[in-house]
Regions:
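A non-catalytic, amphipathic alpha-helix used as a structural packing/dimerization or gating element
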Residues: 93, 97-100, 171-178, 182, ...
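Divalent-metal (Mg2+/Mn2+/Ca2+)-assisted nucleotide/phosphate chemistry catalytic cores
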Residues: 119, 123-173
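Amphipathic, non-membrane alpha-helical segments in soluble helical-bundle scaffolds
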Residues: 64, 169-173, 198, 227
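Structural signal for well-ordered, non-membrane alpha-helices
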Residues: 106, 180-184, 238
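GST-like domain detector, emphasizing the conserved glutathione-binding G-site
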Residues: 1-142, 193, 213-214, 261, ...
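Active-site/pore-lining binding-face segments in mid-to-C-terminal subdomains
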Residues: 206-297
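GST superfamily/GST-like fold recognition
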Residues: 193-213
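Short N-terminal edge-element motif at the start of the domain
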Residues: 159-195
Length: 344
């Protein structure tokens, strides 16, 4: 079924996943209508089962609008419904690695985003002031002050959910710095992860950087000091409607190792052990996962959604041909990502 345009969706400037989809729609030149604050209420639109941003309002099989969330499957749906300027490489090997790196951005790099925003005083103060004002520009100062206190308290008390605490803070922060240094080297060679046109993984990385590099003061200073190229890249990706999206814009699979080996090693160093420990804890019915990441203790509540993430990664690997599976295994050898494809 062809989707009607403009696509309607609810979002917020401080939501990285809103920014992910907004930039992707701009790049793909898909008309959209972004609803901020109470604009979605005025439209009398359906409510999502889980209140996440962004929320898209799309017709179901009966033609009735339904609220749809989760950026990763939405991107794949739009790849089917809109032709041209696709963000999923055609090569199955690139498709799999792109999916893995998109998941890393969505699920691991976001830990740094939440951590910095609600762990340090300067970041807490800025987010507390600005987030309510994005939703309520016309609210009174008194009401906004109340919202500032409410938002900050709610988010700080929920930091443990994403794994940010005094034990894990050094792991998260060191991982963020390494990511910046690795990504800086990649975009010195080529503009995007897979060449000269963006993939969905680029938009996932960009999404977190709209906050880490461009909004929250502590990680923004780190980015500006250590990787100003990444800081500038985030501005560029904001609107890629002028990118030519050349047919040969994605690199070949034989170039993946030279370009992405360090990034894949970082994924294997941090995100993979978290995924595996989470899955193991869930299998045992435990409420908390404990493991070692980067040689240090990691403790956080089990995360059912990331249990699904591991299943989806392995399912996508299983869909590859035997030859492509062999190529991926060879590519991931020595990166720490091997368990993702050896126990699937």
């Amino acid at each position: 079924m062809t989707l009607p345009v403009p696509l309607q969706f609810k979002g917020a400037p401080g939501s990285p996943y809103t920014r992910k989809m907004l930039a992707l729609l701009r790049y793909r030149r898909i008309p959209y209508k972004l609803l901020i604050g109470d604009q979605s209420t005025a439209e009398n639109l359906p409510e999502a089962k889980v209140g996440l941003l962004p929320t898209f309002y799309l017709p179901n099989g009966d033609g009735k609008l339904e609220a749809v969330v989760d950026s990763t499957p939405l991107i794949r749906r739009f790849e089917q419904d809109f032709s041209g300027r696709e963000t999923i490489p055609a090569d199955p090997v690139l498709t799999f690695i792109n999916y893995l790196l998109e998941d890393y951005g969505d699920e691991w790099l976001t830990k740094a985003m939440f951590h910095y925003r609600w762990y340090y005083d300067a970041d807490i103060q800025k987010a507390g002031k600005i987030l309510p004002r994005w939703r309520g520009l016309n609210e009174s100062s008194q009401q906004l002050d109340k919202m500032q206190a409410y938002v900050a308290e709610r988010q700080i008390t929920r930091l443990y959910v994403v794994g940010s605490n005094d034990i894990t803070a050094p792991v998260i922060e060191d991982s963020y710095v390494r990511f910046l240094e690795i990504f800086d080297k990649i975009i010195e060679k080529q503009t995007f992860m897979f060449g000269n046109r963006p993939s969905s993984a680029d938009f996932a990385i960009y999404a977190q950087l709209t906050q880490l590099a461009k909004f929250d003061p502590t990680p923004a200073k780190i980015c500006l000091d250590k990787a100003p190229r990444v800081y500038a890249w985030t501005d560029v990706v904001d609107d890629l409607s002028g990118n030519p999206a050349d047919a040969d814009g994605f690199i070949g699979r034989d170039e993946l190792g030279d370009v992405l080996s360090d990034m894949l090693t970082e994924v294997g160093r941090t995100y993979v052990p978290a995924l595996l420990a989470n899955a193991q804890a869930m299998m045992k019915g435990e409420d908390q996962m404990e493991t070692t990441i980067d040689g240090r203790q990691w403790v956080q509540p089990t995360f059912p959604y990331q249990g699904k993430c591991l299943q989806w990664i392995r399912a996508m690997f299983n869909e590859l041909s035997e030859g492509d599976q062999g190529f991926v295994r060879a590519l991931l050898n020595g990166t720490g990502c091997e368990p993702l494809v050896s126990s699937s």
